[in-house]
Amino acid sequence: MVTTMKEVAERAGVSKSTVSQFLQKRYNYMSENTKKKIEQAIEDLSYIPNEVARSLKQKKTFIVGVISSTILSRFTTEVVRAIEDECQLENVQVIVCNTDDDSLKEKKYVQSMIARQVDGLIIFPTEENKKLYVSLVKNGYPFVFVDRKIDELSVDTVLLNNEKASRACVEALIEHGHNNIGIITFPLGKKAITTRSERLSGYRNTLGKHDIPVNENYIKSGRLDEMPNLIGQLFHMENPPTAIIATNDMILEQVLIYAKNNHLTIPNDFSLIGIDDVSFASFYNPPITTVSQPSFEMGKRSARLLLEKIDQKEQDHEELSEIIRMNPVINHRESVLKLN
């Protein structure tokens, strides 16, 4: 059931007119204490302002929003391009917002797009905004997740079979005689993004399947600006890994830059596999073994799901959501050395 302004006012202990003034950002005669009470009531009740709720019932704007994690990634760029191509077939325009995986920016962009009355959203989500997405589901707002999922939330999602992707990397390295395998990922933590946690899980499980102990020192995670130091830590170990898995295209670039700056050769000094088939991988010297994601198909499928949701006159929120897993493909090249 949709939360009303009256319920917010009652929770905050103020009048409806005061809540209305707050929503219109008219704070001239409003104390900080009152503002905090209203903010907390809105958060507790997952309230969507009436003016936004009304927009959900208005005519289509033929505009959708894409809340992207980072436009620096080739994978993300390809997904967004495919979304745009698919939407153009229906004369629907696309607005793209870049969050840099900042949950606060993500929340602001989602709220801004809804306030602008876009017909729906395709989102690269973070776990921190789960409560926001729960409220959107309750209010019947059309949206789809891509690349990541949020557990215990019924939302149509299109993403890679991430465990299968990292499993393919580890299997290929083991087949070439490697047991000391390092892996580098962006930040993990308790609320790790799906791609990161699942790829690490695939790495761990595959080593376990082959009775190879997991060396926690071979697992490095951090921000992009921390990569040179993290990569250096691997190579300065007493027993460094003979092979490294870069879990996305941006990390792969950082490993290649480190190797060049430190006069390390691939695959003689270390073997390398990257998840995401970057454009230069096939003609790099040596050509880099990669795992491809069907990025264009993922973008196309997520756009089609959203457009279908928008066209539906009634939403059945009790219906189970559809989780679509796309299969990765490994591209064997020349960056993995065969050990004796």
UniProtKB/Swiss-Prot annotation:
Record-annotated HTH lacI-type domain positions: 1-58
Keyword Transmembrane helix: no
DNA-binding region per Swiss-Prot/TrEMBL record: 5-24
CDD domains documented for this protein: HTH_LacI, PBP1_EndR-like
Keyword annotations from UniProtKB, A to Z: DNA-binding, Repressor, Transcription, Transcription regulation
InterPro entries named among the record's database cross-references: Cro/C1-type_HTH, HTH_LacI, LacI/GalR-like_sensor, Lambda_DNA-bd_dom_sf, Peripla_BP_I
A Pfam family the protein falls into: Peripla_BP_3
One annotated GO molecular function: DNA-binding transcription factor activity
Keyword DNA-binding: yes
UniProt xrefs under SMART domains: HTH_LACI (SM00354)
Record PANTHER family: HTH-TYPE TRANSCRIPTIONAL REPRESSOR PURR-RELATED (PTHR30146:SF148), LACI-RELATED TRANSCRIPTIONAL REPRESSOR (PTHR30146)
Function: Putative repressor of the endoglucanase operon.
Record's protein name: Probable HTH-type transcriptional regulator EndR
Gene encoding the protein: endR
